[in-house]
Swiss-Prot record:
It holds the Pfam family Clathrin_lg_ch. It comes from the Eukaryota. GO terms for cellular component: ciliary membrane; clathrin coat; clathrin coat of coated pit; clathrin coat of trans-Golgi network vesicle; clathrin vesicle coat; clathrin-coated endocytic vesicle; cytosol; intracellular membrane-bounded organelle. One of its GO terms (biological process) is clathrin-dependent endocytosis. Signal peptide: none annotated. Disulfide bonds join 199-209. Belongs to the clathrin light chain family. The modification Phosphoserine is found at residues 11, 13, 217. The modification N6-acetyllysine is found at residue 204. Residues 58-73 have a biased composition (Polar residues). This is Clathrin light chain B.
Length: 229
């Protein structure tokens, strides 16, 4: 019965049995073949002149255009891994690296808020400048008016002072007090100048009753060239 099915035909004929296939090696070979097929589809194949890897036979579900892909609305779409899968991977990576929508909205709101704050600060600065300029002009105007009023009041006070009785005596007393104050100040080299202030050097003065021209000339010379000690 076994002979009828031919199970032991190879052993009886003396031919060596085929070695058992390694599952790990077969899996690695299949993966390398698939990777090579993807690279060839995306344009990353070997350069011209090199031997391309043999294409893996696909499932034979039909003949003609059915082996190449699926036709939808007159367009043929590739069912195997091709450029569409590569673009999808890139789009997925972009979605992963893209900022979340909440953070993007927060950044946009912060940018608009900073722009509004900058514009408001510029407007406020301009208003402060105009206000400061106006205040300075008003202060200068008030100061000028106050100075003019002080001048007028001083003139009126001086006129009233000299019109009051005994104004000469009051003025003489004030001059005497100023002279005493200056005389108490000890400044080297001004002694004869202080002495000359006590004399009347007007030759037409009616108060003089004696000839003091000689003494006057001596005092003038001492005032101009004091004696050296």
């Amino acid at each position: 019965m076994a002979d009828d099915f031919g199970f032991f035909s190879s052993s009886e004929s003396g031919a060596p049995e085929a070695a058992e296939e390694d599952p790990a090696a077969a899996f690695l070979a299949q993966q390398e073949s698939e990777i090579a097929g993807i690279e060839n589809d995306e344009g990353f194949g070997a350069p011209a002149g090199s031997h391309a890897a043999p294409a893996q036979p696909g499932p034979t579900s039909g003949a003609g255009s059915e082996d190449m892909g699926t036709t939808v609305n007159g367009d043929v779409f590739q069912e195997a891994n091709g450029p569409a899968d590569g673009y999808a991977a890139i789009a997925q990576a972009d979605r992963l690296t893209q900022e979340p929508e909440s953070i993007r909205k927060w950044r946009e709101e912060q940018r608009k808020r900073l722009q509004e704050l900058d514009a408001a600060s510029k407007v406020t600065e301009q208003e402060w400048r105009e206000k400061a300029k106006k205040d300075l002009e008003e202060w200068n105007q008030r100061q000028s008016e106050q100075v003019e009023k002080n001048k007028i009041n001083n003139r009126i006070a001086d006129k009233a002072f000299y019109q009051q009785p005994d104004a000469d005596i009051i003025g003489y007393v004030a001059s005497e007090e100023a002279f005493v104050k200056e005389s108490k100040e000890e400044t080297p080299g001004t002694e004869w100048e202080k002495v000359a202030q006590l004399c009347d050097f007007n030759p037409k003065s009616s108060k003089q009753c004696k000839d003091v021209s000689r003494l006057r000339s001596v005092l003038m010379s001492l005032k101009q060239t004091p004696l050296s000690r």
